[in-house]
Amino acid sequence: MAGQQFQYDDSGNTFFYFLTSFVGLIVIPATYYLWPRDQNAEQIRLKNIRKVYGRCMWYRLRLLKPQPNIIPTVKKIVLLAGWALFLFLAYKVSKTDREYQEYNPYEVLNLDPGATVAEIKKQYRLLSLKYHPDKGGDEVMFMRIAKAYAALTDEESRKNWEEFGNPDGPQATSFGIALPAWIVDQKNSILVLLVYGLAFMVILPVVVGSWWYRSIRYSGDQILIRTTQIYTYFVYKTRNMDMKRLIMVLAGASEFDPQYNKDATSRPTDNILIPQLIREIGSINLKKNEPPLTCPYSLKARVLLLSHLARMKIPETLEEDQQFMLKKCPALLQEMVNVICQLIVMARNREEREFRAPTLASLENCMKLSQMAVQGLQQFKSPLLQLPHIEEDNLRRVSNHKKYKIKTIQDLVSLKESDRHTLLHFLEDEKYEEVMAVLGSFPYVTMDIKSQVLDDEDSNNITVGSLVTVLVKLTRQTMAEVFEKEQSICAAEEQPAEDGQGETNKNRTKGGWQQKSKGPKKTAKSKKKKKPLKKKPTPVLLPQSKQQKQKQANGVVGNEAAVKEDEEEVSDKGSDSEEEETNRDSQSEKDDGSDRDSDREQDEKQNKDDEAEWQELQQSIQRKERALLETKSKITHPVYSLYFPEEKQEWWWLYIADRKEQTLISMPYHVCTLKDTEEVELKFPAPGKPGNYQYTVFLRSDSYMGLDQIKPLKLEVHEAKPVPENHPQWDTAIEGDEDQEDSEGFEDSFEEEEEEEEDDD
């Protein structure tokens, strides 16, 4: 058996293959994830939305005050250098000679495969004359030619070449290692050990340790775990939090503490500026000692948030701190919503009376505070202040108008263009157009609700203890799209009404006099209709003297006439009875036909119901698969916010609650992917008692005030189906056992009879 040899790369050819593949594995994914986004595309996007969002703070901070950032340039330089190295190594690999080539004697002799023996000998003579050492030729080349000639003419050499790929027989197997030989050289052993020790014993543990230390401090939503603990404690302590208490707890987050967050700063000037703002606000209680809510960092965050809600001007040294605090508020409020929901679930699972769940008002106040923080408005301010150029001074002209009395954004949008223009007459044309552009960009979301019980035979029948699934389909449109459609429909309806106004007046006048003239005609018609209802003619009564004379003169004739009248009456009665029988037969035939039609309709209806249930089942399966596989982007639509320092996307909270009992029925679902349409499933257990229940589905925005949607949800809960005591499957099993017992008894009796016969014999 041939020996095996392991050798390192002395020439460096195989090392280039390894190095090229290693650099490619780093450069290609890094380019995909780290290449800076095209700044021109971002500038074009900002230019397109300038008309609507031009007055927003986040827009002005991004566009009007661009800060030179060297990080994208550094990324591009590093990535381009990596690609240059990768291309150089690939070029180097393409130019390296192949050390291990398959031995082919035809190539050595410059012959085509399949040449005849005569051609081989002829070519060998020509090449041997050319490369023979005695005639000044190349000795190595001559040996290769002789070896190739022997491989093609000698039987043993040809057999070795066909089996082992070499005329000399099997050779030693060599394994190359794609590392340069100087790495394992004894002279460089200390240097190699130092590099390995530095990489795997110093750099790697430091990187992993620092990453682990930072990651264990944060939750999955990048919120400090200490902040979650603070929120859990104070939410449990104060189960019914008003807005003032909620702001106080929100400001106690560790994200604002410089000890836990390096981005949070504390300046010496805060000791002078913060007390001044406290005196201007005038509604901050400093007597309570409730750490960390009364710590300096928490007090500073609370003052900055209250000044933002009041739209107060603050010193420039505090503007940066206020912007940092406001950027953290949406995520912190979402964490507080999660904490409240977790405590509600814990209270339901525990039967202890001491564990008190937070109220529904606390949850809704968190959602309202998110809207307030984004828009920079206090709780009871008008939603119209979210629009540009509408401030406290001119708001009274809009809300206290004698004719319109606009209170909400929907009221303002629903007006006609002329009425809206007269209402906002105090605005210039450019400002009015800007207000209309912003107003038309506001979202208008509609909800379609359907409740059912999935994975059940009768999905529409809700029973006690079943898991109710409420499928909510959200459709998002802009205010401009919705009310333009409504106004176009109204205009289309009003135009033909105006065109035909004269004709309608004429018809009305005609109707007046036509009703008077038609009075007697109607009575005549009614009399005519009453005549066929009479079956017997009324007899004409004659005077008594005339009757006696007629009887005496025509006695027999009178009797015959009387007999004829009796026969006519009998014939009339017979015809009437025949007509009644025919009517009954036709009525029975109609009833039979109607029964058949009703049966067909029921069958068709049942088939349609089955098809609808099957389609719903398939759609639910597809929704689950999409939810598991698809990862939708959370970039929906930018929010119009005049005083928020960061571009925020439209997100929503969707949940079900009982307004009468003030309880939460289903946990809030944070809808972060609503661009046009979105389907959301809300699940909750059915009530424990049968009856009719009135719930409410809430859709609350986390960014806009006054755009929440509320829709009632009625549930009719029935008694749970009884557990079947007898089942056909069980009956078949019992019958099988009885048959087996009968067969066993029959076999026993047959054996007894055979034994008796043997005894008789």
Swiss-Prot record:
Compositional bias of kind Basic residues: 518-537
Record localization: Endoplasmic reticulum membrane
SEC63 domain segment(s): 197-542, 638-715
Region (Disordered): 492-618, 720-761
UniProt topological domain (Cytoplasmic) ranges: 36-69, 210-761
Residue ranges of every copy of the J domain listed in the record: 104-165
Residues where Phosphoserine is found: S743, S749
CDD domains linked: DnaJ (cd06257)
Biased composition range(s): Basic and acidic residues: 583-609
Database matches in SMART domains: DnaJ, Sec63
Coiled coil feature spans: 598-636
Biased composition (Acidic residues): 734-761
Transmembrane segments: 15-35, 70-90, 189-209
Annotated positions of the Phosphothreonine modification: T538
CC terms in the record's Gene Ontology section: Sec62/Sec63 complex
InterPro entries linked: C2_domain_sf, DnaJ_domain, Ig_E-set, J_dom_sf, Sec63-dom
Membrane side Lumenal: residue ranges: 1-14, 91-188
Keyword Zinc in annotation: no
Subunit composition and interactions: The ER translocon complex consists of channel-forming core components SEC61A1, SEC61B and SEC61G and different auxiliary components such as SEC62 and SEC63.
Name this protein carries in UniProt: Translocation protein SEC63 homolog
